[in-house]
Each structure stands twice: as C-alpha cells, then as structure tokens.
C-alpha cells in the first residue's frame, strides 16, 4: 500500500504491475480491496492503481466531521490522477465510483484515455427518466434506499443496516452469501453511509450524457434490478462514444461475481 497527499488528505492506494495506467475507483462501502478478484488480470500487462477514497478504509472514520461530499471526492479523483503524473489514464469506476468517474470524464476529459463505468450510481433528471419507470424513487440504488440503511447503522444496528443495503441492491439473502472478507470490508466502511445520504450527488442529465467525450464502456450485470440498469441504459443511449457490455449470471457486483467475464470485456476495450 502506498499513500499520496491529495487536497490535504493522505489517499491510500494499491499500485501493481507495469504498462498503461488503469485507475479503479470503488463504490459505496468499499475501498481498494474491492478489486482483489481482478487485480491479476487487470495488472498482467498494465499498471493498476486502486485508491481508497477520502474517509474509506484504511481510515477508520466514525461518520462525523471530515469532508465526505461527492464534489470533494470528484476533486480528489482529479487531483490524484494529476499528481500521479502519468498523463491520461484508463479510468474504471463502479457504482458510486462510477458516478465519480463519470464526473471526472465530464470535467477533465484530458485526463482520460478511456472510461469504463460499471453500473454508475445516481439518479436521472426527468429528461432521461423513462416514463414507465418513474416510480423507482424508493427502490434499489435510490437515495431512499441509502437513507433506510444508514438510519439502522446510526441507531446501532450495524449488521442490520449493511444487510438492508446489500440485500436492497443484490436481492434478499445477498448479505448472507458474502464471504467473511467482503463483510469485513463493508463493516470497515459502514459509517461512510451516514454521510452519503447528504453528499450532494447531482442527478445525471441528458446534457451531461451528451457531453461525455471519452470513449466509454458501460458494463452491467444481467441480474441487476432497480434503478441502476435504467441509469446505465439512459446514459449509454446518449453518450456519443459509448458501448455497452452485459455480464451474464451477475448482478451489481459483476466484477467480483464474474471476474473473468468482466476482464474479458474490459481489457479488449482498453487495448483498442
């Protein structure tokens, strides 16, 4: 593990392999350990760099104070890539990290060679939301879903809150199916969810999607339900240089559930 001083914060990161740089941005309740299952394939012929965002493990944050805001994390990601001094990178973002990566691609396309967005998290402006799916404000991936889970954590029911979040994304019983290591990672980052409810995340707009200039691969899990696949399809339909790949037999955590299939679609895209 290395650290890099970014915007007055020591950002921890993994740095493995040699070659073209790939930077991976993790999602909610995750950290650089989220990428363990794909470290080998992604770093075989590339330099893989996976940071933990501000207030995630290895920091043990209690959810109070600090600067846990979406705009802060976007600024941190931009500064991190700049301070690496490697020139344009291939940027992979999953879930909340996909939202961060999307915004980096909008604000600083000069820093991006190619962009991979694995079910980017967030909501849609009305100009992107299909009419027949307008009742998803309470479902998986919504702010209400995060709020329900964080309220249980704040009340002292740590496992109950984490279970509600994971089961809400991946379906009933998903928490029980996690390995002990995956559960521990969520527990280590549980209190970030308290701040995530009011992080100031902006909805995606049609103008945002149309302005995304880097070549972008949207990756989804075939079994994902709720708002996430709707967001993916809406963004991919309007981004000018977009491709889409759907991973069979996988849900929202597709790169952990089907790591080989994930790498088989991502690596050829990055190599082209």
Question: What are the language-model segments listed below?
Answer:
Residues 102, 106, 113-153:
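Flexible "cap/lid" loop of the alpha/beta hydrolase fold
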Residues 71-89:
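Conserved acidic catalytic loop of the alpha/beta-hydrolase fold
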Residues 153-194:
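Conserved alpha/beta-hydrolase catalytic His-Asp/Glu region
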Residues 236-252:
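Catalytic histidine neighborhood in serine/cysteine hydrolases
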Residues 250-263:
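Catalytic histidine-centered segment of alpha/beta-hydrolase-like enzymes
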Residues 93, 97, 101:
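Gly/Ala-rich beta-loop-alpha elbow adjacent to hydrolase catalytic centers
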Residues 181-237:
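Conserved serine/cysteine hydrolase catalytic core
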Residues 9-66, 80:
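Conserved HGGG/HGGXW glycine-rich cap/lid loop of the alpha/beta-hydrolase fold
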């Amino acid at each position: 593990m290395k650290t890099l001083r970014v915007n007055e914060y020591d950002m921890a990161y993994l740095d493995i392999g040699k070659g073209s740089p790939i930077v991976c941005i993790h999602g909610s309740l995750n950290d650089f350990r989220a990428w363990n299952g794909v470290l080998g394939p992604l770093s075989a012929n590339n330099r893989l760099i996976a940071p933990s965002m501000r207030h995630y493990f290895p920091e043990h944050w209690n959810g109070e104070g600090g600067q846990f805001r979406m705009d802060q994390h976007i600024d941190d990601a931009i500064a991190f890539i700049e301070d690496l001094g490697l020139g344009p990178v291939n940027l992979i973002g999953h879930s909340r990290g996909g939202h961060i990566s999307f915004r980096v691609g909008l604000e600083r396309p000069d820093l991006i060679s190619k962009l991979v967005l694995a079910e980017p998290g967030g909501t849609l402006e009305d100009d992107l939301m299909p009419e027949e799916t307008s009742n998803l404000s309470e479902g998986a991936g919504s702010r209400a879903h995060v709020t329900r889970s964080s309220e249980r954590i704040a009340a002292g029911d740590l496992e109950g809150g984490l279970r509600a979040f994971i089961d809400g994304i991946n379906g009933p019983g998903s928490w029980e199916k996690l390995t002990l290591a995956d559960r521990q990672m969520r527990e280590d980052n549980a209190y970030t969810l308290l701040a995530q409810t009011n992080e100031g995340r902006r909805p995606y707009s049609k103008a945002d999607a149309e302005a995304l200039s880097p070549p972008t691969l949207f990756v989804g899990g075939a079994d994902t339900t709720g708002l996430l696949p709707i967001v993916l399809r809406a963004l991919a339909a309007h981004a000018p240089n977009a491709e889409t790949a759907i991973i069979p037999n996988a849900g929202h955590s597709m790169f952990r559930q089907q790591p080989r299939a994930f790498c088989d679609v991502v690596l050829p895209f990055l190599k082209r």
